[in-house]
Amino acid sequence: EIPLRLVGSEMCIRDRLLFGIRDRQLDTDPIYIVFTSGSTGVPKGVVACHRSVIDYIENLSEVLRFNENTRFANQTPLYFDACLKELYPTLKFGATTYIVPKSLFMFPIKLVEFLNEYKINTVCWVVSALTMISAFKTFNKIKPEYLHTIAFGSEVFPIKQLKIWRETLPKARFVNLYGPTEATGMCCYFEVDREFELDEVVPIGRPFHNTEILLLDENNKLVEDGNVGEICVRGTSLTLGYYNNFEKTSEVFVQNPLNSRYPELIYKTGDLGKRNERGELIFVSRKDYQIKHMGHRIELGEIEVNVNMIEEISTSCAVYDKEKGKIVLYYIGELEPDKLVRILKDKLPRYMIPNKTEKLEQMPLTANGKIDRVFLMKKAQER
C-alpha cells in the first residue's frame, strides 16, 4: 500500500506542476523547434508557437475533413514538420495514424498492399511518393481500396501522373497543399475540381483562414493579376523566426511594406507565384530556380513541366550549373537522352534546351521524400 500512496502523491505533485506550467503558458510561447534546410542545405531552427499550430490544426482538419474514423498513413520522418499534419489532427479527433516502414516507399506494390491491409483512407504525402506509385504502373496490378482523401504538397504534381491517380480513384478527393515551414507547414490549399491540360500546373488555390498571401514585386509593390511576384505570407500561420539567428530572421520576417501605420511582420517565402484568370494562386518556382541563361530569364520548373508531359517520362529535375553556364536535366523514363532532346526541341525555345541530359534509374530523394535538388546540383558540378 505504501508504494501506491507514494505513486499517488507523485502524480498529484506532477499534476500541480503541469497545471502551473499550463496556467503560465501564452499562445505566443514556443511549442517546438524544427530544423529545416530548405533549398540551401544549411539547417535553420524554425520556432513555432502554440497559436500558429492550433490555427494550423483547425484549418487542416477542416480542409481534409478529419474525424475519428480517419485512418492516416505517415510518410515523412517524425523529425520533419510535415509529420505534424498527421499527428496533431489524429490526437485532436482520436483518429489513427499508421507509421509506414520507410523501405516500402521503394516498393510501390508492397506500399499499396500496406494501405489496403490497414484500411488507410487518408494520405498527405509529398508528390514524389505518389508519382512513384503511378509511374511504375502499380495500378495495373493493385489499387488502394479504401483511400478517399489524397492530399499532396512540397512539389509540383505532374498532370500526367495526377490524371492516372484520378482515373484510378474517381470518387476520391485530391487536395494540393502549399506552405513553408516558416508558416507552420501549410497555409494554402486547392481541392482539385476539374481536369487540367498536360502543360498546366495544379493551383495552390487559396490561403487558410487567418492567413493572407501577398504577391510582391522587386520593389515590394503588389503585382497585377497574372504577373509573377514573390509569395509573402501574413497572418496567424507565421512562426516566430529562426532559433538563435536574428540576422537570418530579420532578412525574411520583415515589416509588411503595404502597412506603414503599425508593426506587422510578413514572411517572404522565396517562392514565385501568380494568380490565374480564376483568381487562384499558382506556384511558379523558387526564386533560386529562376536563372539567367544565354541572355534569357528562365524558370527551371517550366523545363520540368514540359519534360513531364512526355508519355515515356516518369519524373524529372532540372538544375543549373552557374559556374559552367549549363542547364542539366535528370530524369526517369523509357527514352534515351538523345531522343528526349529531339522531342524537347519541338517544345522549347533553343535557350531552354538542357545542355546535358542524364537518365537515372532512381531519383535521389531527401529524408522527407522530396527530390534532392542539392545532391543533383553537386552531381552536375562534378561532371
Per-region residue spans from a language model:
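ATP-dependent adenylate-forming carboxylate-activation enzymes
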Residues: S9, A95-Y118, C124-M132, V156-F157, ...
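AMP-dependent adenylate-forming
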Residues: S9-E10, R14-D23, V53, R173-N176, ...
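Gly/Ser/Thr-rich phosphate-binding loop
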Residues: K92-A95, I120-C124, S134-P203, E212
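Short hydrophobic "strand-cap" motifs at the C-terminus of beta-strands
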Residues: I33, Q75-T76, V100, W125-V126, ...
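Conserved small/polar residues in nucleotide/adenosyl-binding loops
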Residues: E1-I2, L6-R16, T36
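Conserved pre-ATP/AMP-binding loop-to-beta segment of ANL
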Residues: L17-F35, F66-F72, L78, N210-T211
